[in-house]
Structures are given as structure tokens and as C-alpha cells.
Amino acid sequence: MFSRDNAEQIRDSLPLNFFNLNSNKEEKTPLLQSYLQYYGLNFTGDDGGSKHCAGIVSNGEFKIVCHYFVVPLERQKGTAFLLHGYFDHTGLYGHMIRHCLQLGYTVVIFDLPGHGLSSGPIAEIDSFRQYSGAFLRVLRQAKGLKVNQPWIVIGQSTGAAI
């Protein structure tokens, strides 16, 4: 099980620019590796050889933890942005991530403010604009770094309302 202290340690260990997979270095801390293993997010072979990186998207108010799962270029059909529901987090979406990867979609998924590994009071928000602001920040970073298109968005519960 992962505590808020673990979440803070993982968050503090992540880079700000994480959409760059050109580095051959393994930069996952043991705690991040444990998190990925615990939630079944270590996809090896069954997804066609995807790569993973994680990092921070900061919007000034929150540190948003974002995961980027990339299928090999020759298989890419586009990018699926997954938005989770209230009280959920990335770790609960392993089956959906795997399914998208198997279909040839790169996946971008992030924890909403106050959820999962992202900063903020637990499941507490002043306005839905804070959630949509976090998503827009992720989209801006993805656009600036030319994340593979076309883009699709899949949202569940609160994620669908964003």
C-alpha cells in the first residue's frame, strides 16, 4: 500500500520535463518501480514493447503527476488522454492503459489535484476549474512537445465532466 508520504517522495523524485523518452537511462526510483509493480503498470511484452516515463506538470498551484506510456512509433495510431474519476488515481487504470497500448495508442494519464500522487488536499477542490486547469496544462505541454496525434480523450465520472 502507498501512503501520502510515499506519494510525496515519488512526486519529489520526478522530473519536470518527462515527455522526452530519448534518454536510455533508467531513471525510475525504487519507490516508483514499487508503485508501478503494485498497481500492475509495469507492462512488459504484453503491450508490444511500450516505454514509460513519469514526471511533473506544474500549474503553479499544484504539482500534477503525469504518466506517459508510449508504443513503438511504427505501431502508433495516436494518443489517448485518460482522465480518472473522483477518489480514483492512475493506479486503478492499468486495464484501460494496457488496452489502449495494445490497440496502438500512446497513453497520457495524470492524477487530478488531491488524488493519487499529485499534490493538494485529498479529494478536495475549490472549483472544477482547478481540475480542468490541470488538464489544460498537460495538453499544452503535450502539444509543445509534439506528442503523437490524433488525440482522443477518455474520461470516467469526474474525468468525463472535465
Q: What spans do the regions from the language model cover?
A:
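An N-terminal hydrophobic leader/cap segment in hydrolases
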Residues: 1-58, 64-72
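Short beta-strand element of the alpha/beta-hydrolase
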Residues: 76-85
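Catalytic nucleophile-loop/oxyanion-hole region of alpha/beta-hydrolase
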Residues: 86-92, 116-146
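Conserved alpha/beta-hydrolase
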Residues: 97-120
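Short coil/turn segments at beta-strand junctions that form active-site/ligand-binding loops
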Residues: 77-78, 104-105, 148-150
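Histidine-centered divalent metal-coordination motifs
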Residues: 84, 115, 156
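Alpha/beta-hydrolase fold nucleophile elbow
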Residues: 146-157
